[in-house]
Amino acid sequence: MAAMIPGELLPEPGELELNAGRPVTTVLVANTGDRPVQVGSHFHFAEANAALRFDREAARGQRLDIAAGTAIRFEPGDERQVQLVPFSGARRVVGFNAQINGDL
């Protein structure tokens, strides 16, 4: 067997389901701005760029249902549905755009 490369992942065969069993909220998002907007996997989606139009109350306490370390990019004029999952753990949101800075 060859030596492992630093950072290399060796997953088992088959598919992995991210956030298995977590409730999912689907929201329609439109970029009304004139520049692309990128939102990362663990950003509190309700606090995303103001140029994104969507139901922010439905997104409160949630993040994108995508792999950690990845992001979704919304080009100007784009409109698409995204899936969100609730933050877990202590459910404390601090930073981002400072709209909550505390417990959810």
UniProtKB/Swiss-Prot annotation:
GO molecular function annotation: urease activity
Catalytic activity: urea + 2 H2O + H(+) = hydrogencarbonate + 2 NH4(+)
CDD domains with a match to the protein in the record: Urease_beta
Pathway it works in: Nitrogen metabolism; urea degradation; CO(2) and NH(3) from urea (urease route): step 1/1
Keyword Hydrolase listed: yes
Compartments it resides in: Cytoplasm
Cytoplasm keyword on record: yes
EC number: 3.5.1.5
Residues in the signal sequence: none
Keywords: Cytoplasm, Hydrolase
Superkingdom of source: Bacteria
GO cellular component: urease complex
HAMAP family referenced in this protein's UniProt entry, alphabetically: Urease_beta (MF_01954)
Family membership: Belongs to the urease beta subunit family.
Subunit structure as annotated in this protein's UniProt entry: Heterotrimer of UreA (gamma), UreB (beta) and UreC (alpha) subunits. Three heterotrimers associate to form the active enzyme.
Record NCBIfam families: PRK13203.1, urease_beta
Name used for this protein in its record: Urease subunit beta
UniProt organism field: Synechococcus sp. (strain RCC307)
